[in-house]
């Protein structure tokens, strides 16, 4: 609909509003009224000085409020935001899923946080640890079981540098004192132990889990006495932290290549250790990739240690160049930036020459986490049109900060599986970039190319100049472009009735 519409902006806006109204008709009146606040139209308001960019007005989009009970939300919980996002990539710490086995099992190794090291010896990212709560633990409390689990981990994995306790819902409901257990075991085994109150019922999405995890980093890492290794670390004038990049598909290995080429030294990144986290306050600048999940700790470090921070985006040539140029240290770094940009210019020209003729003017719909939002720039550089976009757990400021990247189209917040499917059916974009829950398989069944933007779908990295072909190739050339329903034999009962 959006990509083929030849009328003016007013006609397009009317069509999109009609589409939203049509989708909402499936709900009861009360749910319909609530969901209507999350769906809106991005309409042009004025031109920037740069005529190629439009300003859009984010009209009446409500965000960061509770999902409507009974609808199939694509959000996660606070536990997912803490364990799965912020703490999960810290590779030499053991992360205990404290509670029933299910939460840890279903979140086991989903994030594709790549790491160096020997699994089970000095790295534990892909391993699952749980206190396996049973009914008696709910009744009598689980503090003793937690203590025993910590002792077992310390005995079985002596090279682990620390432990985090990721609380599941029952822990908060029964009132277990995980902070007291952490302090006690810290003295006994002399390792960092971090209690994280990330029970899934807290907040409205995984976003509060990010905030809680950031606070745990502040309280149990940064505000503790410095370790001997941190005291011995000698900071340099060009030390930077890469924050909010969780090394999905190797992204955190790709980004430092460019940063080190311009003369910066990365001391904390997505392939992280506890020691790197501890020395993070010694950096000169924080480079934040996922603003929504890690802006809290960046703001704290700015206030406490006077470390500035800036957002960066290594998706697509235009934003890579802008990000390299904005982080100015001195004339030496600035000169290096221009040399690096010139070095990769032939590669960029080759990528644009290969992909732009076949992709320019094609439409793409996005439904992503705020971390994935910058991916739109890779499509923008190729002249693709954003037909619809939205976030799972964004706050109002996320829409305000990123609204100018979206041309006229549909805006959806905390969209349900039903709504997203109906929008895609009606708009029929050339590409959908979203997640794996209620998004990936319905879209592929429609025969629409799909790019999985949460864990890179066994692909990656997507950061850097050389990553563009990895991001752009697969959706267009794989067999799943054909609708699976067209090649699947009819169900036996249908075949019998047709005969």
Curated annotation (Swiss-Prot):
GO CC term (a single one): molybdenum-iron nitrogenase complex
Pfam families in the record: Oxidored_nitro (PF00148)
EC number(s) per entry: 1.18.6.1
GO biological process, one term: nitrogen fixation
GO molecular function, one term: metal ion binding
SUPFAM superfamilies: Helical backbone' metal receptor
Cofactor: [8Fe-7S] cluster; [7Fe-Mo-9S-C-homocitryl] cluster
Cofactor comment: Binds 1 [8Fe-7S] cluster per heterodimer.
Sorted UniProt keywords: ATP-binding, Iron, Iron-sulfur, Metal-binding, Molybdenum, Nitrogen fixation, Nucleotide-binding, Oxidoreductase
Keyword Nucleotide-binding among UniProt keywords: yes
Reactions mediated catalytically: N2 + 8 reduced [2Fe-2S]-[ferredoxin] + 16 ATP + 16 H2O = H2 + 8 oxidized [2Fe-2S]-[ferredoxin] + 2 NH4(+) + 16 ADP + 16 phosphate + 6 H(+)
Residues annotated to bind [8Fe-7S] cluster: 77, 103, 169
Superkingdom of the organism of origin: Bacteria
Binding residue positions for [7Fe-Mo-9S-C-homocitryl] cluster: 290, 454
Assembly and binders: Tetramer of two alpha and two beta chains. Forms complex with the iron protein (nitrogenase component 2).
Job of this protein: This molybdenum-iron protein is part of the nitrogenase complex that catalyzes the key enzymatic reactions in nitrogen fixation.
Family: Belongs to the NifD/NifK/NifE/NifN family.
Protein name in UniProt: Nitrogenase molybdenum-iron protein alpha chain
Gene that this polypeptide is encoded by: nifD
